Each structure stands twice: as C-alpha cells, then as structure tokens.
Design a protein with these regions (language model features):
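Fe-S-dependent hydro-lyases/dehydratases of central metabolism
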Residues: 1-124
Length: 124
C-alpha cells in the first residue's frame, strides 16, 4: 500500500485498502472557517427543528475554527456569521478559535500546520 492507502486503512479500521475501495474513515481533526461554518450551523439548526438536538460534539478538542475569508467583515451578513461562529465555539466548548484581530489571525489552511494541530498521517 502507498502512504495514502495506509492512512485511510488506519482511519477506517481496515488492514488494507486499495484503489476504488469505498471507506468510512474516522477523522482526526475538523476545521471550520467563516465560509464553511455557516453551512454547518444550518445543519445543526435543521436537526434541532426536527427534534434532534445536538448538545455536544464528538470531541471539541479535535475541532478548530478560523476567521480568515470575510474579515474584516464588509457587510452585515459576514459580521453576523462571525458572531454565530463565536457563539458556536462557546456553546460547544471549542477552545481553538482563531479570531481576526485578536492576535490569533492566520490563514486556515496554514494554521493547521503552523500550530501543529494536524500531524503527518492525520485525516482532516
């Protein structure tokens, strides 16, 4: 197996995988940002309206949020989305929230490596 196949085999609990295999892999880390986050929040809201309240995450220490696409906010919707992300991180105990203008700012796709939140072999 090549390195990608080994990583996916580990994450899916299989001894091996091959091209064209369909696997369900457990992720090591989850990243949200100010573009993807609002869509995630809509799913949580939809579930709540269906009577399925999600009161906790699988592991808040494996989730991190970055504000880097629509900051500083140029319109009301972008600003509201940042507030919603902040509320989400507070409500679900996510400590790794890289807020624009708080000395924690960075590009989400490089923060993962610069802050050692994702390590070689991780699926995220």
């Amino acid at each position: 197996m090549n390195i990608v196949e080994k990583i996916l085999a580990r994450a899916s609990g299989k001894s091996s995988v091959a091209p064209d295999d369909v696997v369900f892999a457990d992720v090591d880390k989850v990243m949200m940002h100010d573009v993807s986050g609002p869509g995630v929040l809509k799913v949580f809201d939809k579930l709540k309206k269906q009577g399925i309240a999600v009161d906790k995450l699988f592991d808040p220490t494996k989730v991190w949020v970055a504000e880097d696409h629509f900051v500083p906010s140029a319109d009301k919707l972008s600003a509201e989305n940042i507030v919603k992300l902040s509320n989400f991180t507070k409500n679900y105990g996510i400590e790794k929230h890289f807020k624009y203008g708080m000395g924690q700012y960075g590009i989400c796709h490089t923060l993962s490596h610069e802050q050692a939140m994702v390590m070689p072999g991780d699926v995220y």
